[in-house]
Swiss-Prot record:
Pfam families: UreE_N. This is Urease accessory protein UreE 1. One of its GO terms (biological process) is protein folding. Gene3D superfamilies: Urease metallochaperone UreE, N-terminal domain (2.60.260.20). SMART domains: UreE_N. Involved in urease metallocenter assembly. Binds nickel. Probably functions as a nickel donor during metallocenter assembly. Belongs to the UreE family. GO terms for cellular component: cytoplasm. The keyword Ribosomal protein does not apply.
Length: 146
């Protein structure tokens, strides 16, 4: 098992980008594909796209991001790649429904973002679980799927 205990930088950093580019031409860049919830973790065990058994053990002040470089030497590199995130798009009927939906999403500790008048909830589990909790607002039309 390969222990990865620090973030060396981002793949977009000029100092790292050239080295990563050269290694990628040689087929020596491995990726660790992480979900939106896993990327928040500091301790995690998973396999790279090449099958390398990796254990991530970061200090609390370090935060993984898409493109975090966890290993880089003359032979290979290991880079974090964030999986596509899925969102549930909801549109409230009016301002009162928008406030209620926002309050509810906050109480549920759901990660959200806004796109115009649409509230997008980051799905960290089955969509059906979210829809079940939102059923009363969806049923009476206070909120609809966008």
């Amino acid at each position: 098992m390969l222990i990865l205990d620090r973030i060396l930088g981002q793949a977009s950093d000029p100092a790292l980008a050239d080295r990563l580019h050269d290694l990628s031409h040689a087929g020596q860049v491995e990726t660790l594909s992480l979900s939106g919830s896993d990327i928040q973790r500091h301790r995690l065990r998973l396999a790279s796209d090449r099958g390398t058994d990796c254990a991530i053990r970061l200090e609390r002040h370090q935060q993984l991001r898409n493109g975090s470089v966890l290993m880089l030497d003359s032979q290979r590199a290991i880079v974090v790649q964030m999986q596509d995130q899925q969102y549930l798009d909801l549109q409230p009927r009016d301002a009162a429904a928008a406030l209620e939906l926002g309050y509810f999403a906050g109480n549920m500790h759901w990660a959200v973002r806004f796109a115009g008048d649409t509230l997008q909830i980051l799905l960290n589990g089955p969509e059906a679980d979210y829809l079940e909790r939102l059923a009363p607002m969806l049923a009476d039309g206070r909120v609809q799927r966008a």
